[in-house]
Amino acid sequence: MTTEKKTMNISEIQELLPHRYPFLLIDRVIDFQEAKYLHAIKNVSVNEPQFTGHFPQLPVFPGVLILEAMAQATGLLAFKSFGAPTENELYYFASVDGAKFRKPVVPGDQMVIEVEFLKERRGIAAFSGVAKVDGEVVCSAELKCARREF
């Protein structure tokens, strides 16, 4: 039995997500299994625009952007599991529960984003997510996202 990992490069990610610089927060998918889980990487660079104001003397990657990276990972998992979005569909970040920030994320860190599909009901999907740096959890949360036409 093979355990070959399924991956996605940045071109494949951009085919599925509408986000672009500076708001595309997933650099690469390192493994996923449809309707189960997705693991992705976000490389944190001092050259990102949020560091000019958050905070110039001690740059810290904003927690809300860690949550957004998790939400983008759930979008990738949903689209790979249940079909790519149509031209008039978006995948909205609907809610977050139990968000915990355990350690700051700083330039030079590589975040590994891990999301797990929990359930779907009436077009709203629930996920659990964690972000890790060097194997340590820096953030965890439960996320809900909704796929809707516009």
UniProtKB/Swiss-Prot annotation:
Its main location: cytoplasm. The keyword Lipid metabolism applies. It is found in: Cytoplasm. It catalyses: a (3R)-hydroxyacyl-[ACP] = a (2E)-enoyl-[ACP] + H2O. Gene3D superfamilies: Hotdog Thioesterase. Its EC number is 4.2.1.59. GO terms for biological process: fatty acid biosynthetic process; lipid A biosynthetic process. It comes from the Bacteria. Belongs to the thioester dehydratase family. FabZ subfamily. Involved in unsaturated fatty acids biosynthesis. Catalyzes the dehydration of short chain beta-hydroxyacyl-ACPs and long chain saturated and unsaturated beta-hydroxyacyl-ACPs. This is 3-hydroxyacyl-[acyl-carrier-protein] dehydratase FabZ. The gene is fabZ.
